[in-house]
Amino acid sequence: MLEPQDQKKLDELFSSMQEANGCFLGYPFAKDFDYEPLWRFMSLTGNNLGDPFEPGTYRVNSHAFECDVVDFFARLFRACSCEVWGYVTNGGTEGNIYGLYLARELYPNAVAYFSQDTHYSVSKGVRLLRLEHSVVRSQSNGEINYDDLAQKATRYRTRPAVVVANIGTTMKEGKDDTLKIRAVLHDVGISAIYVHSDAALCGPYAPLLNPKPAFDFADGADSITLSGHKFLGAPMPCGVVLSHKLHVQRVMRNIDYIGSSDTTLSGSRNAFTPIILWYAIRSLGIEGIKQTFQQCERLAAYTADELNVRGVSAWRNPNALTVVLPPVEDSIKTKWQIATQDVSHLVVTPGTTKQQADALIETISNRNR
């Protein structure tokens, strides 16, 4: 049992986190989830070590639910479950590094290409894996500059190309086109190509957009990653990574200690997050995901329009939940936890309310007077 001062410290931490949870708009974390029916699992020593599609010695796991989650996204990303393998990660960074790892094992002499708007985890990944890489310029909307990609790739036309396609860039939610990427590389004479789609935020709803962005397996992706906590919602970071089975077989090793194949990046893995993601997709279904996106998109459009009416130059990419605006001052950035680089942005995720949006709009417009 805790000492009174320790209990007080714990209570104060909860109050602080609860207050901060009610006033952040700058990072993509869904907030309207309710997983109380799942709390009983927290009393178990769950560990999803090993390949989720193989039996293993340790049985306190949620592998069956993890496989359901992978199968759901395989179908959503237009792939046959028999041809695609995947697992639940601890977030988008692990998914990106895993995709790059598979690419390096396929093409050890490859050059990796990604735009300047790419998430920082990709730069970390190429350094960890010692992949030679080239950073490509972005268009003003955050999408990769295909002309610059062609120019950069021409220098290394005799070597395989690994490209990270952003399906919703970190700051502007710009979406790269995997079909265009492959066409550009073919035009400069490169035929050995691996494309990894980073769909951290947009993965659950991108297949439902009209027009649908080109990013999935039918559009030439070799691997795809998405985050579970950003749009579907979870109390802890999580994600899913999927790839063609042929790529995964190159890294597979049999481990007697666990009685299973080692195909994942991490050994011990969270058994709780696959249950959360399973619960989310079973509760929502495709139609629920679509309706949730439409609600968020309407609020994002309203927010951008209201800011512009009040003299703030805000904009969105088509079908984006991210509202881009000029850099906000430090007091606003601190209170509302607004991500800021050369621009600031706010992200309307499930659980974001009109009251929150109005309060931020009022604060920003008052500072601009």
From Swiss-Prot:
Gene3D superfamilies documented for this protein: Type I PLP-dependent aspartate aminotransferase-like (Major domain)
Assigned keywords, A-Z: Decarboxylase, Lyase, Pyridoxal phosphate
Gene Ontology biological-process annotations: carboxylic acid metabolic process
GO MF annotations, alphabetized: histidine decarboxylase activity; pyridoxal phosphate binding
Complex formation: Homotetramer.
Catalytic activity: L-histidine + H(+) = histamine + CO2
Modified residues (N6-(pyridoxal phosphate)lysine): 230
Alphabetized PANTHER family for the sequence: PTHR46101, SERINE DECARBOXYLASE (PTHR46101:SF2)
Cited Pfam families: Pyridoxal_deC
Protein family (similarity comment): Belongs to the group II decarboxylase family.
The protein's name: Histidine decarboxylase
Record organism: Mesorhizobium japonicum (strain LMG 29417 / CECT 9101 / MAFF 303099) (Mesorhizobium loti (strain MAFF 303099))
